[in-house]
Amino acid sequence: MAKNVRELFNLSGKTAIVTGGSRGIGKEMAEGLAEAGANLMLCARRSEWLDETINEFRGRGFKVEGILCDVAKPADVEAVVKATIEKFGAVDVLINNAGISWGAMPEDMELEKWQQVIDVNLTGCFLFAQAAGREMLKQNSGSIINIASIAGLTSSANGPFYAGYVASKAGLIGLTRELAASWGRKGIRVNAIAPGFFHSRLADRVIDLYERSVQENNVIPRIGNEGELKGVAVFLASDASSYITGQTIAVDGGMTV
């Protein structure tokens, strides 16, 4: 018998790792998973933000742990997955959300800055997918959600210009498809979310430059609101999307239509 809708979206008993889960859209998506019943392992680079979010979530009755992590360091990644298994016994969902950016014209882009962006936004996602994927393969089940960007679907035609960021997010979309193809027959689904403009630590630096354009040109003429990403995250994490893999869902108010 088919599950009803409540059952399809229910994450009770599931455990999710959320990178960059202490602030912004990462925190929002983690909140959504917890509201659907999931246990959380949050990782972030700054203890003050991580501790604040953990305390807030525990105050709401969520089952949540946290660990400091630099996603570009393999040892840190392995430590997060190990801690998750030790605490909760499984890794059912991974949200690869941690990211950085650096703006510069291509001819002025410092190689060191380029590499930092690639290391976090692309290599870090691969490292976490690899480590979590090994555990998911033992279970023959799992959902990996990579947080890409509409920057990976388009370009910075009107500036400001972010060659490293755009390349990293386009690469992440390609990695999403390849991981989906590699692991689909082994019970693991891999999808991506490509947000448009939402208020966050990264986006707030440029939102003022784009907000008028968004209001004039978007099909839905505004910046994304708080809460408009977590539903998509829960959908992709849950059995509601059990026949979906290798896809990138743009949540952008119609910007890429």
Residue positions per predicted region:
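Conserved glycine-rich cofactor-binding loop
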Residues: 22-23
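Short, small/polar-rich loop/turn modules that mediate ligand/substrate recognition or access, typified
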Residues: 184, 189, 244-246
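A conserved structural motif in NAD(P)-dependent oxidoreductases
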Residues: 218-229, 240
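Active-site helix of classical SDR
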Residues: 129, 165-168, 176
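Residue(s) in the substrate-gating loop at a strand-loop-helix junction
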Residues: 149
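The beta1-alpha1 cofactor-binding region of Rossmann-like NAD(H)/NADP(H)-dependent oxidoreductases
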Residues: 47, 68-80, 111, 227-228
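Substrate-binding pocket helix/loop in short-chain dehydrogenase/reductase
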Residues: 105-106, 110-118, 203, 211-214
